[in-house]
Amino acid sequence: PGEGSNFYNLREYIPGDSMRKMNWNAYARSGKMMVNEFERDAVSDIILIIDSRSVSETGPVSRNSLVYSTRAAASLAQFFLSRRDSVGLVTYGDEIVSVDRDTGKKQLYVLLTKLAGAMAKGNTPLKVVTNRILPHINRGSPIIIMSPLEDDPTIIDAIRDLRARNFDVTILSPSSLEFEFDARRLDRTGYEVLKTERDILISELRGLGANVMDWEPEMMLSTALAGARGF
C-alpha cells in the first residue's frame, strides 16, 4: 500500500520529503524546490503506540511526555484517517490497551476518546508490547511510537525485532529531561549526564533504521511531525 506510479500533481518541497520525489525540471524552470505527488494505490495500516507508563508523567502537569504524545497521536490519527488510511492504537502502562485498525470519522472519535482517557501508570516494557501485537500487524505496516525512551532496558531489543521484520518504525520522543530541567527539578550536571545517555540511545535506534525525532518542549508539534516524516 502507499503511492502508485501514476503522476498526480506537483507541490512545493516540505522538509522531510524524499529527494527521490524531487522534480528537477520544475526546479530548473522556477527556482523553487518542487516534488512529484502520485495517486495512492490503497490505504495503509498505521499503528500508533503510546507510552503511558508512570515515567511519561515526569514534568509539569500540562507539559510532560504523555500530554505531548497524546496530542501528537490525535493529530496523526486525524491526518491519516483523512487520507483514508486505517489507523489502530496501542497504549501501554500498567496494562496494554488496543484499538483495532479501522477507517473513517467513527474511528477518529474512538481514538480521540481513548487518548483523552490515557493515564500515566505502571511500567510495562516495550518488548512485552511488541511481542503481544506483532502477530496481529500486517508486515510492513508503519509503526509510530511516542515515548520518552526512559527506564526501559528492552527498547533496543524491541525496535531491533520490529526492524528485522521490515516494519517502518518512527519514534516521536518528548524529552522528559527537558521538562524536568525547564521546571528546575534537575541540575545542570545531572541533566548533562542523562542527556548524553539519551543521545547514545537515540543514535543506536537510528542505527537500527528507526526514524527518531528528539522532541524538545519548545518545539512546535508541526515541526516535530515534519522532522519525523517518512511514514
Residue ranges with predicted function:
Residues 67, 120-127, 192-196:
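Conserved phosphate-coordination/catalytic loops
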Residues 103-141:
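Von Willebrand factor
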Residues 133-143, 149-231:
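Von Willebrand factor type A / integrin I
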